Amino acid sequence: MAEKRRPLLGFVGKLPSGTTAGNSGKTHCPLCMGLFKAPRLLPCLHTVCTTCLEQLEPFSVVDIRGGESDTSSEGSVFQELKPRALQPQIGILCPVCDAQVDLPMGGVKALTIDHLAMNDVMLESLRGEGQGLVCDLCSDREVEKRCQTCKANLCRFCCQAHRRQKKTTYHTMVDLKDLKGYSQIGKPILCPAHPAEELRLFCELCDRPVCRDCVVGEHREHPCDFTSNVIHKHGDSVRELLRGTQPHVEALEEALAQIKGTNSAVQERVKAVAADIRTFSEGYIKAIEEHRDKLLKQLEDIRVQKENSLQLQKAQLEQLLADMRTGVEFTEHLLTSGSDLEILITKGVVVERLTKLNKVEYSAHPGVNEKISFSPKQKAGLCRGYEVYGAINTKEVDPAKCVLQGEDLHRAREKQPASFIVLCKDATGESMGRGGDNVQVTVIPNDKKDSPVKTMVHDNKDGTYYVSYTPKEPGTYTVLVCVKEQHVQGSPFTVTVRKRHRSHPGVFHCCTFCSSGGQKTARCACGGTMPGGYLGCGHGHKGHPGRPHWSCCGKFAEKSECTWAGGQSAPRSLLRTVAL
């Protein structure tokens, strides 16, 4: 149903009480609740401060890796490809959605930097008269101006020093209050390998942004182009994934609405049936009151079972919807607000997340129905010596209670029909006593998983279903039996298919000489021969087994399966005994 969530032992940093995901838009950390500081983008597309992530309790699982880099998180722009043997993989849990995050080799600081969040923080700070912004040079004083040439925020002292230097004398300086109308004021994104160079190009071969020094160095022979020239192709691929993800949000919302309606219907039916039960039980005084209490308890059990099932499905769909919304909202924000370079930097994480979300399977229909009814005329046995009437009927099949029956359930022969019985039961373990349930059977060869065997399911109309299939080849097969898309007891199970039973084409004789009437050219599979040019076996002669056997394969048991494989091992004269 939903994305894999890994339980974590020990303390894990969680959201503070009353905190919701995505608090304060895109500028505040969901953990510390303050403006983002060095925000890192997780594979689930949630953003958290670097220091907050470092404070989370990590866990480790054994991970086998070859010569590939970590793919769970993009990390920084550059990652070395180093072969790694069996080693523990360090991970954390996302403090927003509890998704497992496998950390790259560089740890938290190797996760992708969320440049969109940094830009939003800058804009948020400007709206608050620059409060919270510190000088990019001295990191000590509050910002007063911004150098539009260097794209750096400067305090008054550094601004004066900036103007006194010959190289920066003529740089354009702007007051912070004059930048409030800007939508993009982020810092230039510099190359990790060459900090003096800005990332302006994109390597198609390595699928990552590069600088000018990278192009003439490590990526000299690689196809590279400016980010503005390649953004259309890569942006279109992300938009295509987004178009495939958006319909899931509507489908999940509709499914949750159906669950809510079904839950209300269940509650209404419970109330109605309870009223019927109370009305019917008034005439029988103590006996009926006792019977009534039993019926109400049974009804409550049914309600709890149905409600728990609906609540579980609701929780799973809500979590999946939250994940889908996060993916859609972040991607839409990225495509509408992000720069070309920001889209390219974040593209890998977004594509991986949306691809994973698009592969998640879920049911858009409630897992249970509101079918609960009361039959007042149905006999319910004796209660305190009185014959009472009235029973609750749900008769909803419970896959966990359904069983498989058959003598040769795990054995079959090639090209011969095999069969077994599926007995459907309800939640109380009683036979359904009727047909109409959706029984699905799949028979798959273990060595040819893409070639399932054709199966037939016959409804006997009494709660049992006759399943038959004919395996074409010997080997091991896996049989999956599902009711309401859930496995029944004993499913899946394996079936060993042996070769088809082969009858003997020869004769069961004491020796070739006797069975052939003394023919010299008659042979026997036992390998015995006789002097005088006889090709077959004879009593007391060389190679004779000393007991009756089959002429075709040499087996001693008269009632057995022939093992003669044909071809060179069985000349034509070997079977002449049959004709004679």
Swiss-Prot record:
Gene3D superfamilies: Classic Zinc Finger (3.30.160.60), Immunoglobulins (2.60.40.10), Zinc/RING finger domain, C3HC4 (zinc finger) (3.30.40.10)
A Pfam cross-reference name: zf-RING_UBOX
Keyword NADP: no
Residues the record lists as binding Zn(2+) 1: 135, 138, 158, 162
Keyword Flavoprotein tagged: no
Major site of localization recorded for this protein: cytoplasm
Classification via InterPro entries: Bbox_C, Filamin/ABP280_repeat-like, Filamin/ABP280_rpt, Ig-like_fold, Ig_E-set, TRIM45/56/19-like, Znf-RING_euk, Znf_B-box
Alphabetically ordered keywords of this record: Coiled coil, Cytoplasm, Metal-binding, Nucleus, Repeat, Transferase, Ubl conjugation pathway, Zinc, Zinc-finger
Residues that bind Zn(2+) 2: 191, 194, 214, 219
GO molecular function: ubiquitin protein ligase activity; zinc ion binding
SUPFAM superfamilies membership: B-box zinc-binding domain (SSF57845), E set domains (SSF81296), RING/U-box (SSF57850)
Subcellular location: Cytoplasm; Nucleus
Family to which this protein belongs: Belongs to the TRIM/RBCC family.
PANTHER family assigned to the protein according to its UniProt record, in alphabetical order: BONUS, ISOFORM C-RELATED, E3 UBIQUITIN-PROTEIN LIGASE TRIM45
Name the UniProt record assigns to this protein: E3 ubiquitin-protein ligase TRIM45
Organism: Bos taurus
